[in-house]
């Protein structure tokens, strides 16, 4: 018999430690571990972490086996791990109905439970009796399921279980937009059951998704059916949100020690090494103590000041927990593991020694790791005064199995029994290693032979869609439908993946479906979804964005491949040449660079060997039967004649026997419109409407047609007015100016509706006119009246065979209008159809997840609706319609702006610095205002032009508003002199950092608006011979530009085209209006407000108080505090007035820095502003200013000249605000300071 080696003896000692502290508690039937002797429930997260020591020890025995008994011991340990993992699987699979429901609802009531009965795997508390939604717990289970499977363990035994795991992937893939209760089961730190977005959950979900992607759950014994599929776009959503959250942990926790599990073992979810180090140092600096780390600041758990009889905390109570938070040795085990994986031996040694000092020796000298160390009740005051000086006492579970397990695992690795690669077989530890440069492969395809010839004339040789066969080309929406079959299991009542928008990472791969290669075109060129794809310049911008995104986010094997089809809509109006924007983009891609990305153009067949290709094994024939329903319509050749897919579908009859081809053709046939209207004539309709860029609704045409048809009560059928509050009343019978702004508009037209013999309305007259007219505008007018009077599903019986509902006809008309790029009419029909961005909820989520709250509608509340958490698609669109008061035009424009904001958030996040709330209603308002100012035109002309802008021009205008570069003003923390606000400086700014399109954007806008004005005048003279007038003002009135006030010279009206004035006049007022509308504040503003609240009882803004008690609940760096401050400031409807209030608060922060105890009780900030205004008026009058120069804004009572004053200088706003603040608070200041003032 061989003698036992030293390593074997040491392993035996760890085996005894594992047995005595962990395995002795494992249930022999279920394999689950109870939390402690007193708490018999099994928590999912704790169980996974607690078994890691057993898994590691088993790997160590297998690696260092001296004899057969060691191999047997390794097998025994590994099977204990399998038993626990399968026990947890049984617990969760019993709740399969919740998994199915949660995929669609993301509701806390539909979530998997966080803990189960150790003996039976049953649930132990009700759905609403615990914070069950903890995505990090489900994610850590999936992460280690992947790691353990990769290490050789066989945990999953059947395809039913594979499908369940696939659905768990769908369960966690929305973690980036799902607020949960987090790793500490508390949600918001007030412990009141408020869920929030947690970085620990997002990071762990991201790690689990990456680990499971393309993993065979049967290991080496598996096949295609047991492979898990993950969509790369969902992973990157998590990555993006995680990067934006860190080093913060959530909205209520500015830092949390649980982030150690995200930036290091086990998740390794962060790819930016600098961000990893920043987060790590934040934890060490703010949370580390003598016995471990606090979980987060002001954590009251098991502190002497916590009331054990009460589950929740009062908000102001959190201040009591400051500096006495319990310290957890658990987190030092993470630092040990981090040191091992990073190769930092010094860190490993330091924390091992520190941990040894806080371990408690149990029976027979067994080292036990306590749950936490708490301040003794009699030493609380001493700890308050001198943090980290009082000796603490151990409390809670002993041992804390989670911490005990990681302590043993860290010791095994530190002593060399395990290498990092053995405990991390999927190589997640290399996440921060720089990735190779990405070259995006672009295959340009022509829809038809004619387009191919046009491209060839330009020196661009391409293939047609038909010529790439047997490679098959499909639109992105088809890939979304295909993925909806993934994970489907009828026996378990699992429906598969919910239908969702397909991102660019998903469409940039090739797909192997039943031995046939498929490629999918990007989502943004699908013209059936939203009208952005009808604008060729917008297509180029979206292509540029996607290419840039691919270069920074692509992490898969192989290069990304974009299939870019050139369709008929990308040609000029005559159809003989390529649109200049598209041609320029193609030439740049051929040159090798576009949008900052390296490009390789070529044929699809040339890219087969270098592309990333995924085998969609779930599309193979399986136990679930066929891919499609037997009752679908086999007539799949009815695609629209203008659809770019025609080149591909021409071969469809040759492959009717192919089930996949029939399935895909079925999807195409049911997602494409079928033409039913008569084609537009070239003479009477198309050419005229090409030239006629009119108002969004072209209400005049509607009324004219109503007169011809003798329609009564036309006002009942007109589109709802844009933000009806404070709207002018218009009389359509004459051209008088608007009057009585506060009245709801009415229309009085004395006409008669045709009736049949029985006296009923004869709608057949309308339908007959619809059939005969070739004018697109007239068709829209008639369909709108039918839509409002008969409903969208009314069958017009336009043709004998088949139905022709109003909705179907409007959809077809939308396609026709799109071809002539009539943007006002496009938006109008989109509004009628309630046509929404398919990825609207994703755009909203992108913004929210970057900690930007959204509001829709115009202030004040309750009209302005706040969106502070991700919403399901339908709920989001309902909220937008409600906020827009049913106005379909503004509803559709709000969605459009939301998409553009999300685009800029992904590509230029710096535009949104120090902005926590994006008020889309105000942004639309300020866009119209700025357009009027830039073009020196009236508000009516500007608002009409805004609704007729192309999407690309609208996006450029938004960039102009966000960047503010035209004004040569920016926010800065370094003042140019002592009197300047620390947040504002003036200097010349170039166009560095903007794209060429954005640099020339405003010039294009001016040109486009001038054309709109010319066409509007032409239409008013040609199309309205009866003296009618254009109703541009009816869509977006002056009251929309300045809510609550009329547009007068004192409130921001703009001169006409021929008025000249000093370009500097109005510059600062415009700057303040922009910053106020965008909620932009100086750097560090919210932290300074927190300090001010420490010196007073609160700040009052327009009667709404921000109390000082807020600081007892929230810390300075919390997002929650920033949002709370924003909610008070947003009570002010006028952007420029709001910005003056911000400047006044900045002055108060300077006073708060003085060494005094208090600067007042409740400080009325608006009063300080009005005192400053009075001082300004007095001084201006002494200098000879007259009443006209010193006109006041009627809404706020502030002199417009003060709004337009620079912050610095003798007459600067900061000068007067400083004097006003000193005057207001002087009674609270020491006499010596008052004398200095």
UniProtKB/Swiss-Prot annotation:
A GO-annotated cellular component: plasma membrane
Localization in the cell: Cell membrane
Biased composition (Low complexity): 1042-1056
Residues recorded as bearing Phosphoserine in the entry: 629, 729, 735, 758, 972, 981, 985, 1007, 1018, 1020, 1023, 1030, 1127
UniProt xrefs under Gene3D superfamilies: 1.50.10.10
Residue span of region Disordered: 1021-1069
Tissue-level expression: Isoform 1 predominates in muscle, heart, brain and testis. Isoforms 1 and 2 are expressed in similar quantities in the other tissues. Isoform 3 is highly expressed in slow muscle and heart.
PTM notes: Phosphorylation of Ser-1018 by PKA stimulates the dephosphorylation of the beta subunit and, thus, reverses the initial stimulation of PHK by the faster beta-subunit phosphorylation by PKA, that occurs in muscle in response to adrenaline. Cys-1234 is farnesylated, but the C-terminal tripeptide is not removed and the cysteine carboxyl is not methylated.
One of the Pfam families matching this protein, by short name: KPBB_C
Listed GO biological process terms: glycogen metabolic process
Residues lipid-modified (S-farnesyl cysteine): 1234
Gene Ontology MF terms: calmodulin binding
Signal peptide: none
Activity modulation comment: By phosphorylation of various serine residues and by calcium.
UniProt key word rRNA processing: no
Site description Not methylated, residues in chain: 1234
Job of this protein: Phosphorylase b kinase catalyzes the phosphorylation of serine in certain substrates, including troponin I. The alpha chain may bind calmodulin.
Family as reported in the entry's similarity comment: Belongs to the phosphorylase b kinase regulatory chain family.
Subunit organization: Hexadecamer of 4 heterotetramers, each composed of alpha, beta, gamma, and delta subunits. Alpha (PHKA1 or PHKA2) and beta (PHKB) are regulatory subunits, gamma (PHKG1 or PHKG2) is the catalytic subunit, and delta is calmodulin.
Name of the protein: Phosphorylase b kinase regulatory subunit alpha, skeletal muscle isoform
Lineage: Eukaryota, Metazoa, Chordata, Craniata, Vertebrata
